[in-house]
């Protein structure tokens, strides 16, 4: 087991799926979701996004590095009769081996929140079906306070998320940065909803 897997297993040991929250980009824009189809919740954790997607009628695949999180989510999904398939995978290691295992044209919806591994992004976009939607939200370099990862490699540069979505139709983009009254607004993060042509 990798150090990263151990770290996340420790974090999820004391937490429960019932407390898992879906990301802002998803909850505020659920009206864009298809009524059925396949969805991927990448870096799922305890499955806030996966649970939200399944309750919206989608067949969900949840992938995370933490076996603890995936076990808890699998049990919760079964108890709640939600269509969520859980898989514990180290996608970063798989991407380094050039075999991330994300099939092309596999998903109608892909949701990623609070996770960034740049080498995986091209495969992620190819995994979208035509007209498929990407909901992505994660931390930015510009921040107020100390929220998010301390390692800047896990934070987006200004407009970086937009650049990664080049060739997709942008339905929504938000990155408030340090503009205006920093006590209000969507701070420390960027979000995008993009559709594959």
Locate each region found by the language model:
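Conserved class I S-adenosyl-L-methionine
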Residues: 1-34, 36-45
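Conserved SAM-binding loop of SAM-dependent methyltransferases across substrates and taxa
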Residues: 46-58
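Conserved SAM-binding motif I beta-strand of class I
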Residues: 59-64
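Conserved SAM/SAH-binding beta-strand->alpha-helix loop
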Residues: 66-68
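Conserved SAM-binding strand-loop segment of SAM-dependent methyltransferases
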Residues: 80-94
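A short acidic, Gly/Pro-enriched loop at the edge of an enzyme's catalytic core
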Residues: 97-108
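Conserved beta-strand signature within the Rossmann-like core of class I S-adenosyl-L-methionine
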Residues: 132-139
